[in-house]
Regions:
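Generic enzyme active-site microenvironment
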Residues: 10, 54-55, 168
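Secondary-structure boundary/capping positions in well-ordered alpha/beta enzyme cores
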Residues: 4, 48-49, 134
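Thiamine diphosphate
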Residues: 15-89, 151-155
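Glycine-rich phosphate/diphosphate-binding loops that line cofactor/substrate pockets in enzymes
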Residues: 2-3, 45-46, 159-160
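Glycine-rich ThDP/TPP pyrophosphate-binding loop and its adjacent helix/strand module
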Residues: 63-74, 78, 83, 87-179
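Beta-sheet entry/capping signal
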Residues: 6-8, 50, 166
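Short amphipathic alpha-helical segments, especially helix-boundary/capping motifs
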Residues: 12-17, 41-45, 98-101, 127-131
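N-terminal glycine-rich anion-binding loops that anchor highly charged ligand groups
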Residues: 2-19
Length: 179
């Protein structure tokens, strides 16, 4: 797409920042849970640049849920790539709003009990009725799903570059080490 010379990425202080040394574009580190809101601010001062927030599910749907929701309501023209590993990975693998029923985590060693911890949050279900430019959920589980996910990310950036508004792509991803 030829965006790397212009792209500005905002990352969270959690797991998402661990790969920025391999990126070939400029990055900004935001406070925990605030990359999407920070990306909105960056886009307002640099409207000519493509702007992406790269954030985990815990930060986007827990500590940063207000920012995620407000950006969707406002339909601000930024891309959010949310890596959903179904737990709080950076702090040791605890149960998160996205943890699945029965999923074992460090804080739910017998598995998540929905009666005690609630059902997993699903962003596509929650935001499907909102007037945003693009919303999708992909998986990084095998080559076929990775290729589908790449197409989702491409479509989000195409809509973003056309100025259509908020684009959120959630990518289901394992966290085998619970960093």
């Amino acid at each position: 797409m030829g965006l790397s010379d212009k792209l500005l990425a905002v990352v969270d202080v959690a797991c998402g920042f661990l790969n920025i040394d391999s990126w070939r574009f400029d990055t900004i580190m935001a406070a925990h849970g605030r990359p999407i809101a920070t990306a909105v601010g960056v886009k307002k001062v640099r409207p000519e640049n493509p702007v992406m927030a790269y954030i985990g599910d815990g930060a986007a749907y827990s500590i940063g849920m207000a920012e995620t929701m407000h950006t969707a309501i406002s339909n601000d023209n930024v891309v959010a790539i949310v890596i959903n590993n179904s737990l709080y990975g950076m702090t040791g693998g605890q149960c998160a709003p996205t943890s699945l029923p029965g999923q074992k985590t460090t804080s739910t060693p017998r598995g998540k009990d929905p009666k005690k911890c609630g059902m997993p949050f699903n962003i596509v279900d929650a935001f499907s009725g909102m007037d945003i430019a693009y919303l999708s959920r992909g998986a990084l589980s095998d080559p076929a799903n990775i290729n589908k996910s790449k197409k989702m990310v491409r479509k989000a950036f195409e809509k973003h570059m056309a100025g259509e508004g908020f684009c959120l792509v959630e990518l289901l991803s394992p966290c085998p080490t619970n960093l």
